[in-house]
Amino acid sequence: MKKTLLGSLILLAFAGNVQAADNPNPETKGKVTFYGKVVENTCKVKSGNRDMSVVLNDVGKAHLSQKGYTAMPTPFTITLEGCNANTGTKPKANKVGVYFYSWNNADKENSYTLKSTLTGTDKADNVNIQIFQENGTDAIGVADKTIDDFTHKNNGSTNSDKPTKNHISSATALNNQTGDIALHYIAQYYATGMASAGKGPTSVDFPIAYG
């Protein structure tokens, strides 16, 4: 009898906790809605571009003596291949490019440039790498894990399936292209302060992105 009563009390307590969890204060709960789309016409990164190196020429530290100074713009190209046309009714992309991101190397405090991965005495202090679109005037902000350009917050009951900012770099119209697509970019040194002599390697990841 005692065991039965004890079990009943435990069940009642558990049920009460579940009910409290199901009906929390509105200010202590929320919901995240995720949007996405899979498209029919897709491309591949050309094999020689999947793990590539871009070498900037040496530069004198006097050219990078103050924050915001830049030097040695260097072009590089990422080539896509194997793009398949979509002539049917399935969802298709109208443009293609790449999305630059780095959870470790993006420097939020310095225009989302790329900070050096080197440590020790060989490192060039206060020197980052900045990426530009092909025109050389539109800087590409490398996305990091704090960026919220994909998130709509406090917008009432209406959600949006579009990001607040476009992060598809060098977006090129697909138009059912099946050949190679060359995406052109520019990399350059970017001073975050008075530069010192040394090396400044860094890296960035990119998946293909569609729009």
Swiss-Prot record:
Q: What does this protein do?
A: Mediates adherence to oropharyngeal epithelial cells. Helps the airway colonization process.
- The residues forming the signal peptide are 1-20
Q: Which family does the entry's similarity section mention?
A: Belongs to the fimbrial protein family.
Q: Which residue pairs form cystines in this protein?
A: 43-83
The record's PANTHER family line, in alphabetical order, gives: FIMBRIAL SUBUNIT ELFA (PTHR33420:SF3), FIMBRIAL SUBUNIT ELFA-RELATED (PTHR33420)
Statement: the UniProt record of this protein carries the keyword Translocase? no
Q: What is this protein called?
A: Major fimbrial subunit
Recorded source organism is Haemophilus influenzae
Enumerate the SUPFAM superfamilies for this protein: Bacterial adhesins
